[in-house]
Amino acid sequence: MALLDVCGAPGGQRGDWAVPLAGSRQRSDPGHYGFSLRSPELALPRGMQPTEFFRSLGGNGESKVQIEMAHGTTTLAFKFQHGVIVAVDSRASAGNYIATLKVNKVIEINPYLLGTMSGCAADCLYWERLLAKECRLYYLRNGERISVSAASKLLSNMMCQYRGMGLSMGSMICGWDKKGPGLYYVDENGTRLSGNMFSTGSGNSHAYGVMDSGYRPDLSIEEAYDLGRRAIVHATHRDSYSGGVVNMYHMKEDGWVKVESTDVSDLMHQYREASQ
């Protein structure tokens, strides 16, 4: 309530903070992901959409409270005969400002699962860390690793519960299980897609241009590394919100390995010199 006083929220907005009602279906059994009292939960005023709550802080509506965050990045992943390649840039922007060039946008969920960050960094980190916890609990309960499909479905279910609440996340979940390499795209609306190639972020159209022209399922390992590297470098060259270094991972049958972390400026100079 003190926070509401500081923010100057209207008196009518002072509802109880979100607590499951008596008789609520929310519970903490292993198969339920309702984030009830025994699980991490977002504190929200009951009966109010977060977007409406933030809008109410503007009083007469002239303060223009901005909840649509400006952000940019370039991440990509694709499957080929030797596994999955994940490549990302490392620039983090805050509106029109560059916050840092040293962000690792690949989240290491476990030795056989990787997730990428695109959108709001806080949302991606929070939900994918929560996914890592659920994957670990699955392993402890069942004695085997969770499949890539099931892990992506868990994340999709989490997003569906908070659909329309202002989250911003476009993530790729990749890994290796009994069925081989897997690659899924999940966003803040709960959309879940399986495919051989995905790219997210403000520079994804530039990355797709390179990948579409060079992708083949039968790429060799070095060809796959070069394709992912070139796609990120081209995107950072054309997209002002992407930059820094190329962080590349290779998902193999025995787990992921980090391939390289190379400055995009050095790579661009190398490509220009090679073309002359």
Curated annotation (Swiss-Prot):
Q: What is its main location?
A: cytoplasm
Q: What EC number(s) would the UniProt record show? A: 3.4.25.1
According to its UniProt record, this protein's enzyme class is hydrolase
Q: Name one GO molecular function term.
A: endopeptidase activity
Q: Which Pfam families match?
A: Proteasome
Q: Spell out the residue numbers of the propeptide.
A: 1-72
- Subunit-level organization: The 26S proteasome consists of a 20S proteasome core and two 19S regulatory subunits. The 20S proteasome core is composed of 28 subunits that are arranged in four stacked rings, resulting in a barrel-shaped structure. The two end rings are each formed by seven alpha subunits, and the two central rings are each formed by seven beta subunits. The catalytic chamber with the active sites is on the inside of the barrel. Component of the immunoproteasome, where it displaces the equivalent housekeeping subunit PSMB5.
Q: Which Gene3D superfamilies match?
A: Glutamine Phosphoribosylpyrophosphate, subunit 1, domain 1
Put simply, this protein is called Proteasome subunit beta type-8
Main role? Answer: The proteasome is a multicatalytic proteinase complex which is characterized by its ability to cleave peptides with Arg, Phe, Tyr, Leu, and Glu adjacent to the leaving group at neutral or slightly basic pH. The proteasome has an ATP-dependent proteolytic activity. This subunit is involved in antigen processing to generate class I binding peptides. May participate in the generation of spliced peptides resulting from the ligation of two separate proteasomal cleavage products that are not contiguous in the parental protein. Required for adipocyte differentiation.
Residues marked Cleavage (site): G72, T73
Name the catalysed reactions.
Cleavage of peptide bonds with very broad specificity
**Please, one GO biological process term?**
immune system process
- The annotated active site, in chain numbering, is T73 (nucleophile)
Induction is noted as:
Up-regulated by interferon gamma (at protein level).
Q: Which family does it belong to?
A: Belongs to the peptidase T1B family.
Which InterPro entries does this entry report, sorted A to Z?
Answer: Ntn_hydrolases_N (IPR029055), Pept_T1A_subB (IPR000243), Proteasome_bsu_CS (IPR016050), Proteasome_sua/b (IPR001353), Proteasome_suB-type (IPR023333)
